Protein backbone atom coordinates (compact mmCIF):
# COMPACT_ATOMS: atom_id res chain seq x y z
CA UNK A 1 0.00 0.00 0.00
CA UNK A 2 1.54 3.26 -1.09
CA UNK A 3 1.31 6.64 0.60
CA UNK A 4 -1.67 7.81 -1.48
CA UNK A 5 -3.77 4.95 -0.10
CA UNK A 6 -2.41 5.33 3.45
CA UNK A 7 -3.53 8.99 3.36
CA UNK A 8 -7.06 7.77 2.63
CA UNK A 9 -7.02 5.72 5.85
CA UNK A 10 -5.30 8.23 8.15
CA UNK A 11 -6.24 11.88 8.80
CA UNK A 12 -2.62 12.77 9.68
CA UNK A 13 -0.57 14.97 7.39
CA UNK A 14 2.96 16.39 7.39
CA UNK A 15 4.72 16.52 9.75
CA UNK A 16 2.67 13.97 11.70
CA UNK A 17 1.98 11.22 9.17
CA UNK A 18 4.39 8.53 10.39
CA UNK A 19 3.65 5.60 8.06
CA UNK A 20 5.31 5.74 4.63
CA UNK A 21 4.26 2.37 3.25
CA UNK A 22 2.33 -0.78 4.16
CA UNK A 23 3.99 -3.94 2.89
CA UNK A 24 1.81 -6.72 4.30
CA UNK A 25 -1.75 -7.12 5.55
CA UNK A 26 -3.46 -10.27 6.83
CA UNK A 27 -6.83 -10.74 8.52
CA UNK A 28 -5.42 -9.61 11.86
CA UNK A 29 -1.97 -8.11 11.27
CA UNK A 30 -0.16 -5.42 9.33
CA UNK A 31 3.44 -4.52 8.52
CA UNK A 32 4.54 -1.10 7.35
CA UNK A 33 7.47 1.25 7.68
CA UNK A 34 8.58 4.79 8.36
CA UNK A 35 11.75 6.06 6.69
CA UNK A 36 13.45 8.36 9.19
CA UNK A 37 15.14 11.27 7.42
CA UNK A 38 17.52 13.85 8.86
CA UNK A 39 15.02 16.39 7.49
CA UNK A 40 12.33 15.37 10.01
CA UNK A 41 11.26 18.40 12.03
CA UNK A 42 11.37 16.44 15.28
CA UNK A 43 15.07 15.64 14.76
CA UNK A 44 15.98 19.33 14.67
CA UNK A 45 15.45 19.62 18.41
CA UNK A 46 15.72 16.00 19.63
CA UNK A 47 18.71 16.30 19.84
CA UNK A 48 20.59 18.68 17.52
CA UNK A 49 24.01 17.13 18.17
CA UNK A 50 22.71 13.54 18.28
CA UNK A 51 19.32 13.35 16.54
CA UNK A 52 17.15 10.41 17.62
CA UNK A 53 13.47 9.75 16.95
CA UNK A 54 11.44 10.45 20.10
CA UNK A 55 10.01 7.29 21.62
CA UNK A 56 6.53 8.75 21.79
CA UNK A 57 6.59 9.18 18.01
CA UNK A 58 7.58 5.54 17.57
CA UNK A 59 4.52 4.64 19.64
CA UNK A 60 2.41 7.03 17.56
CA UNK A 61 3.66 5.36 14.35
CA UNK A 62 2.59 1.99 15.77
CA UNK A 63 -0.83 3.44 16.61
CA UNK A 64 -1.18 4.85 13.08
CA UNK A 65 -0.40 1.54 11.38
CA UNK A 66 -2.83 -0.14 13.80
CA UNK A 67 -5.49 2.38 12.78
CA UNK A 68 -5.05 1.44 9.13
CA UNK A 69 -5.52 -2.20 10.12
CA UNK A 70 -8.68 -1.27 12.05
CA UNK A 71 -10.34 0.00 8.88
CA UNK A 72 -9.15 -2.96 6.82
CA UNK A 73 -10.29 -5.54 9.41
CA UNK A 74 -13.75 -3.99 9.46
CA UNK A 75 -13.88 -3.95 5.67
CA UNK A 76 -14.58 -0.26 6.02
CA UNK A 77 -13.49 2.53 3.75
CA UNK A 78 -12.55 5.68 5.62
CA UNK A 79 -15.18 8.37 5.35
CA UNK A 80 -15.78 11.71 7.02
CA UNK A 81 -16.98 11.19 10.55
CA UNK A 82 -15.32 7.81 11.15
CA UNK A 83 -11.87 7.43 12.74
CA UNK A 84 -9.80 4.91 14.62
CA UNK A 85 -8.30 6.96 17.45
CA UNK A 86 -5.35 6.17 19.70
CA UNK A 87 -6.94 5.12 23.00
CA UNK A 88 -3.96 3.98 25.05
CA UNK A 89 -0.67 2.18 25.35
CA UNK A 90 0.55 -0.39 27.85
CA UNK A 91 3.79 -2.27 28.41
CA UNK A 92 5.76 0.22 26.30
CA UNK A 93 9.46 -0.58 26.12
CA UNK A 94 12.22 1.20 24.21
CA UNK A 95 15.16 -1.03 23.38
CA UNK A 96 17.14 0.70 20.62
CA UNK A 97 17.60 4.26 19.47
CA UNK A 98 16.15 5.14 16.07
CA UNK A 99 18.29 7.61 14.14
CA UNK A 100 18.26 9.43 10.82
CA UNK A 101 18.68 7.03 7.93
CA UNK A 102 16.89 4.17 9.68
CA UNK A 103 13.90 2.39 8.20
CA UNK A 104 11.57 1.74 11.12
CA UNK A 105 9.54 -1.42 10.46
CA UNK A 106 6.14 -1.29 12.18
CA UNK A 107 4.30 -4.53 12.99
CA UNK A 108 0.88 -4.74 14.61
CA UNK A 109 -1.22 -7.81 15.41
CA UNK A 110 -4.75 -7.83 16.82
CA UNK A 111 -5.04 -9.61 20.17
CA UNK A 112 -8.47 -8.43 21.38
CA UNK A 113 -11.58 -6.68 20.08
CA UNK A 114 -14.48 -5.64 22.28
CA UNK A 115 -17.20 -3.00 21.80
CA UNK A 116 -15.26 -0.84 19.37
CA UNK A 117 -11.95 -1.09 21.27
CA UNK A 118 -9.09 -2.94 19.61
CA UNK A 119 -5.88 -4.07 21.31
CA UNK A 120 -2.74 -4.84 19.32
CA UNK A 121 0.68 -6.27 20.12
CA UNK A 122 3.11 -4.00 18.31
CA UNK A 123 6.80 -4.06 17.50
CA UNK A 124 9.01 -1.44 15.87
CA UNK A 125 12.38 -2.62 14.59
CA UNK A 126 15.38 -1.47 12.59
CA UNK A 127 17.46 -3.95 10.59
CA UNK A 128 15.74 -6.82 12.39
CA UNK A 129 16.61 -5.45 15.85
CA UNK A 130 13.67 -4.53 18.08
CA UNK A 131 13.61 -0.80 18.83
CA UNK A 132 10.31 -0.69 20.75
CA UNK A 133 7.38 -2.83 21.80
CA UNK A 134 3.93 -1.83 23.03
CA UNK A 135 0.37 -2.92 23.48
CA UNK A 136 -1.63 -0.32 21.58
CA UNK A 137 -5.34 0.30 21.96
CA UNK A 138 -7.42 2.12 19.39
CA UNK A 139 -11.08 3.02 19.46
CA UNK A 140 -13.50 3.20 16.55
CA UNK A 141 -15.13 6.61 16.92
CA UNK A 142 -17.68 8.69 15.12
CA UNK A 143 -16.63 12.33 14.93
CA UNK A 144 -18.80 15.44 14.81
CA UNK A 145 -18.70 15.27 11.02
CA UNK A 146 -20.75 12.06 11.08
Swiss-Prot record:
Keyword line: Cytoplasm, Lipid A biosynthesis, Lipid biosynthesis, Lipid metabolism, Lyase
Q: Name one GO cellular component term.
A: membrane
| Disulfide bridges in this chain | none
Its chief place of residence is: cytoplasm
What is its EC class? lyase
* Keyword flag Lyase: yes
Catalysed reaction equations from the record: a (3R)-hydroxyacyl-[ACP] = a (2E)-enoyl-[ACP] + H2O
Localization recorded for this chain is: Cytoplasm
Q: What is its EC number?
A: 4.2.1.59
Mind listing the GO biological process terms from this record? Answer: fatty acid biosynthetic process; lipid A biosynthetic process
**Is RNA-binding one of the keywords UniProt gives this record?**
no
Q: One Pfam family, please name it.
A: FabA
Q: Name one GO molecular function term.
A: (3R)-hydroxyacyl-[acyl-carrier-protein] dehydratase activity
Active site residues of this protein: 46
Role summary: Involved in unsaturated fatty acids biosynthesis. Catalyzes the dehydration of short chain beta-hydroxyacyl-ACPs and long chain saturated and unsaturated beta-hydroxyacyl-ACPs.
Q: Which family does it belong to?
A: Belongs to the thioester dehydratase family. FabZ subfamily.
Q: Which NCBIfam families match?
A: fabZ, PRK00006.1
Protein name listed in UniProt: 3-hydroxyacyl-[acyl-carrier-protein] dehydratase FabZ
Which species does this protein come from?
A: Acinetobacter baumannii (strain ATCC 17978 / DSM 105126 / CIP 53.77 / LMG 1025 / NCDC KC755 / 5377)
Amino acid sequence: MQIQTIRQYLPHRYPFLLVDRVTEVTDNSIVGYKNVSINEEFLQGHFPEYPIMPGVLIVEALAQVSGVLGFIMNNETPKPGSLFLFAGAERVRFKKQVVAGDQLVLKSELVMQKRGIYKYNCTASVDGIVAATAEIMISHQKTEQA
